Structure formats: C-alpha cells, structure tokens
Amino acid sequence: MIQTTHAAEMEATMGSGAMGVIKETFLVPSNLYRVYLTFMAQILSQWSGAGSITVYAPDLFKLLGVTGENESLLVTAVFGIIKLIAAILCALFLVDVIGRKRALLIGITLQAISMVYIAGFLTSVPAMGVDENYTLPADKKGASEGAIAMIYVSGFGWALGWNSMQYLLTAELFPLRIRALCTSMAMTLHFANQYGNARAVPNMLLPVATGGIDPKGTFWCFAAITIIGGVWVWFSIPETAGRSLESMDRLFALPWYK
C-alpha cells in the first residue's frame, strides 16, 4: 500500500518544477479556492478562542470564579484530560461516522454556545477580572460554575470541530502535485495565527482603561468569530469524507455554491 501510494505521488509530480507547482496552485481556480478554504479554516479556528483557553486555562478558571492555586490547577488538569479523551474519540470514531462537515458544524455550535454563555456571565459581573478586590456574590455562584462547565464543553466542541478539521481539510483537499506546497503554507499560517493569538489574548483581557477590551469583551469577540466561522463553514466547506482524489478534483470543478 505504501509503495503504491509513493509510486502514485512520484507519477503525479513527475516533470513538475517549482514554478510549475506554484502556477498550478495559484492560477488554477479550483486549486486557488482550496487554498482559500484552508487559509480561512486556519484563521477562523485559531481566533475562535479555544487555543488561548488551553494556553491560559489556570488564569481563565480563576477569572470565572475558581479560587485557590490547587483548585485552579485541578480544574485545569481535568480540562486537559477531557480534551485528550475528546480528541481521541472524535478522531477515531465520530468524525468518520457523522461526516467532516457535520462534525465541524456540531463542534462549532457547542463552542459558540459556550463562548456566548461565558461572555454573558462576565457581562453580568463586569468587575470580574477588572477589579482585583472584587468578590463574587453568592447569587452568582451557580452562574460561575456554569461558566466553568462551559469551558469543558468548549473543549469537547473544539476537539470535534476545528481541532480535527483544520488538519484533515488541509491533508485531504489538495491534489498530490501541489499538496506539499499548500500544506506547508497552511501550517505556516496555522502557527503564525496560534502565536499571534497567544500574544494578543493577555492584552485583550486588560481593562479598557489600560488598552484592553475587558474579559467580557474578549469572550464576546471569541463568540462572534466562532459564529462567523460556523456560517462560513455552512456555505463554503464541502463534505469530503470518503472521497477519492479523483472525485475530489471533480468536486472542486463545480461552482462554489454547489
């Protein structure tokens, strides 16, 4: 099987120099559209907030009402375990069972619901994360626990949706002749946005008076980008599960709205 695949790749790329690959990537409309899809997937996924939640999980749990260093580390560890189990289950079972596009839409929906809830909670307690001396009222304790639970829900949604699809789409969409170049570009954009998001979020969480957009504004921003991503996926991403390379080429020969 490996030898057959290698032979097919060698045959597909035979006689294609660097300039030929670049021209085929950017001058063939169906290939350029695939580049657009993978680039948008990388941008929308990284700025949906899930990556920064993982990076800054202890601080964000404290922001939502977790008190104490040990408690913060514990809920962060549980979050990591949930994301690991969800990623394995989604990658090995759910994505192929329910289809790429449906999995992506369900995951984005879960993530959007989570972000909207967290943003709404932070809006109801605007001093959270802004005033260091602020104490969460007793009547907001239940809402705080709900926001913490929504972090876990967003982790599952991320594993089912963007986390799986941003890599699968990049690997599956392109013909063999241009796959190496296009995958390299997509992954470069992926890590550039991941780095940019990780650097931006601490500044976004700052109070408006010090140049940030507040915690509530940060999560409303994540919610908006996640919802925009869901709408974009609905109209732009085709179902690619079970398609051969030949049928993939025929799929992208159609107009985008089909």
Language-model-detected regions and their locations in the chain:
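AAA+ P-loop ATPase catalytic core
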Residues: 2
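Alpha-helical transmembrane bundle of multi-pass membrane proteins
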Residues: 6-258
